[in-house]
Amino acid sequence: MGLRFPPKVLEHILSFIDSNEDRNSVSLVCKSWFETERKTRKRVFVGNCYAVSPAAVTRRFPEMRSLTLKGKPHFADYNLVPDGWGGYAWPWIEAMAAKSSSLEEIRMKRMVVTDECLEKIAASFKDFKVLVLTSCEGFSTDGIAAIAATCRNLRVLELRECIVEDLGGDWLSYFPESSTSLVSLDFSCLDSEVKISDLERLVSRSPNLKSLKLNPAVTLDGLVSLLRCAPQLTELGTGSFAAQLKPEAFSKLSEAFSNCKQLQSLSGLWDVLPEYLPALYSVCPGLTSLNLSYATVRMPDLVELLRRCSKLQKLWVMDLIEDKGLEAVASYCKELRELRVFPSEPDLDATNIPLTEQGLVFVSKGCRKLESVLYFCVQFTNAALFTIARKRPNLKCFRLCVIEPFAPDYKTNEPLDKGFKAIAEGCRDLRRLSVSGLLSDKAFKYIGKHAKKVRMLSIAFAGDSDLMLHHLLSGCESLKKLEIRDCPFGDTALLEHAAKLETMRSLWMSSCFVSFGACKLLSQKMPRLNVEVIDEHPPESRPESSPVERIYIYRTVAGPRMDTPEFVWTIHKNPENGVSHLAIK
């Protein structure tokens, strides 16, 4: 390059670049930029814990202060990844402790985190401040107690939808009396009761506490006491609202909420009785986020609540809201940017539909800033998809989950091909897309042609043949993660577009028609890919033509992993070796 920046000037310039992707691009400019970038990067994101070794990360980024780490594939959220598959945090924690003692923040998602990991964190990082565990497992409240007792500058402790061995609520007592630094505390996934007196003392001596998310065991009386201690909260996850309504309790609850002048986000509300909802009305005008995904409240009561939420930007709710409830959202919540509607029952059927596609049509017409949708329903139509695409071209995330597999447009009995063509063609900024319902290969031809910015794509029960995969891998230029289940494609498209897989983060396939022989050929052809065959009930022998139950393919610079359980077969690069599986000891 003709222009060279002095190192200090370049360091100063890089200090304004926060995006991981932008910093990655900077590091590719030249050797000196690579060196400056790696020595100054404070925040590191690893999207797949097996894509790179912990040692390589610590070696490259010696000044790392924050690590974000992801483990199991996304389909683990739907119980499609067997227990014991992997995603172990210990090698990473051990490597960080040995080389990065100045680490201050760890965020992990879908990882196996043991108490030993948490104890190592507490003992190794003298100025540790942030621990966020999302959908993690393997640890108990003893591990959390170690973090609470030792990390004297802890600002954030969040356990989000984790599976935790709950050994009792006394872990809160391990926070030292000198602990005053907490900004966010989330223990909503725990089961046991906590000592409200311990929690009150902790909250009272934490003047900067802004976010508090409680578990269902916290009663209304406990909630009232805590709100009195922390009226400065901006984010609150309540405990259970199942207690019988008493006038005195209602009055205290209303008063406590009315004093929370800065509250912007509200969640929890487990088993809330409709009679208690008016106690929340005082905070509704200031809410920007409302999560009612655990609140079994019916449509009329929801409407009374939502009509007061004029600033709402994010709404999570169950399908009990019905079409009329979403029509109210469209009328009253003009700032809405994100909508998620979850099923209230796992086995919905078309004979008792609490909401239809019309609810989402209402919102797409009335909420002009809407850019993210997750919508579970029993049936859908092409006409609804046309309207959504026309009214909301600014959508960045569209995840439609039609619960009944292979469900066509229920009014015309046609595939939903043209509707998803409209979404792909009309929503040019789409980054994430989930499709379902009856779809032919044509739908994926349209998606491949128009969805040029889609980075994550999820598909279930769709397509006719290999052409589906061909259209996606040849057309979706920005695709990084592809998840497919129960679709009728096989080897041809997978092998034909093997080079595309090296530009992606991962490909997950389950219950498709991919053969064992194709997996071996792919691994031999693409040495930088790990090809894992996952089968909990493997046959006694595997002929080349035998289909595999699940495969997980991902790009890596670390080589085959060494912690595979017996039901995971790693395809080696040496065709004579074929496959191997190593049991975890």
Curated annotation (Swiss-Prot):
Induction: Partially repressed by miR393a (microRNA) in response to flg-22 (flagellin-derived peptide 22). Residues 1-48 form the F-box domain. Residues 77-78, 343-348, 401-405, 460-461 are annotated as: Interaction with auxin-responsive proteins. The keyword Nucleus applies. 1D-myo-inositol hexakisphosphate binds at residues 70, 109-110, 340, 397-399, 432, 480-481, 505. One of its GO terms (molecular function) is ubiquitin-protein transferase activity. SUPFAM superfamilies: RNI-like. One of its GO terms (biological process) is defense response. Keywords: Auxin signaling pathway, Developmental protein, Nucleus, Plant defense, Ubl conjugation pathway. InterPro entries: COI1_F-box, F-box_dom, Leu-rich_rpt_Cys-con_subtyp, LRR_dom_sf, Transp_inhibit. CDD domains: F-box_AtTIR1-like. Disulfide bonds: none annotated. GO terms for cellular component: nuclear SCF ubiquitin ligase complex; nucleus; SCF ubiquitin ligase complex. Signal peptide: none annotated. It is found in: Nucleus. The record marks 135, 161, 376, 485 as: Interaction with auxin-responsive proteins. Its main location: nucleus. The keyword Nucleus applies. Ubiquitous. Pathway: Protein modification; protein ubiquitination. The F-box is necessary for the interaction with SKP1. Component of SCF(ASK-cullin-F-box) E3 ubiquitin ligase complexes, which may mediate the ubiquitination and subsequent proteasomal degradation of target proteins. Auxin receptor that mediates Aux/IAA proteins proteasomal degradation and auxin-regulated transcription. Involved in embryogenesis regulation by auxin. Confers sensitivity to the virulent bacterial pathogen P.syringae. Mediates glucose repression in yeast. Part of a SCF (SKP1-cullin-F-box) protein ligase complex. Interacts with CUL1, SKP1A/ASK1 and SKP1B/ASK2. Interacts with Aux/IAA proteins (IAA7 and IAA12) in an auxin-dependent manner. This is GRR1-like protein 1. It comes from Arabidopsis thaliana. The gene is GRH1.
